[in-house]
Design a protein with these regions (language model features):
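Structural motif corresponding to alpha-helix initiation and N-cap regions
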Residues: 26, 74, 96-99
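Short gly/ser/thr-rich secondary-structure transition/capping motifs
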Residues: 19-27, 93, 150-153
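Short, basic, glycine/proline-bearing loop/turn elements
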Residues: 13-14, 83-89, 116-120
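Non-catalytic C-terminal accessory region of glycerolipid acyltransferases
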Residues: 1-6, 97-207
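Short amphipathic alpha-helix with an adjacent loop that forms part of the alpha/beta core around
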Residues: 30-33, 103-104
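N-terminal membrane-anchoring alpha-helices
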Residues: 1-23
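Catalytic core of membrane glycerolipid acyltransferases/transacylases, capturing the structured
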Residues: 6, 19, 32-93
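Short, glycine/polar-rich helix-capping loops at beta-to-alpha or helix-loop-helix junctions
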Residues: 10, 72-77, 155-157, 164
């Protein structure tokens, strides 16, 4: 079976799963219907962030993202992620193979979801972001759609009590970065757009 089949199947399963485990409160969903390709840049609280985003991507768009290379050693993850074209990345270094794969996905007209912070927040607040998203957006000449998510950190505690929890998602309009700006300036613009949509306690260093 083709990877397209597996992606459509997984997309449907994720949408159903998120409806079961939480109550989604979404603002700005129309911005995800922006013509692809584009980048989605969001804060990173838990492993529930990627399925939350995937459940909201319109079926007309194809989404991919990155996963830490360590999960490639876990057979179920490797089999699934390879079939839906997840991009493996080596943490702690500039992974040029992964960067090339992200650019190739955008060139194919896909949507790529990334977290500018690079890793999950241990405090819940935004951490200092890296310049990767800004660099990719400039290189591929694609816009960035900022996304703010909170409440996902309560999914697992609620599931243990057999309760659904409230998950909030705010999606901002596409940002077209100014090519004259530095990557630092572009990263600040993206992160402040995310922070502006988050409740104050989640804004961290961008509060």
């Amino acid at each position: 079976m083709s990877n397209e089949f597996w992606y459509r199947l997984f997309h449907g399963v994720v949408r159903l799963l998120m409806r079961i485990v939480c109550r989604m409160h979404v603002e700005g969903i129309e911005h995800l219907s922006h013509p692809a390709p584009y980048l989605v840049a969001g804060n990173h609280l838990t492993q529930w962030d990627p399925p939350t985003l995937m459940s909201l991507i319109p079926p007309t768009h194809r989404l991919t993202g990155i996963a830490a290379d360590k999960w490639r050693k876990v057979l179920p993850f490797r089999l699934l992620f390879d079939r839906i074209n997840v991009i493996w990345v080596k943490r702690g270094e500039v992974d040029r193979v992964a960067l090339s794969a992200v650019l190739a996905a955008l060139k194919r007209g896909w949507v790529v979801g990334l977290t500018p912070e690079g890793t999950r927040s241990k405090t819940g607040g935004l951490q200092q972001a890296r310049n990767g998203v800004a660099w990719i957006a400039a290189k591929a000449k694609v816009p960035v759609i900022p996304v703010a998510v909170w409440g996902v950190e309560n999914i697992e505690p609620s599931l243990k009590r057999l309760h659904r929890t409230d998950v909030h998602v705010r999606i901002g309009p596409a940002i077209t970065l100014d090519p004259a700006d530095s990557h630092d300036a572009s990263t600040e613009r993206i992160m402040h757009a995310i922070a502006a949509m988050l409740p104050e306690k989640y804004r961290g260093v961008y509060g």
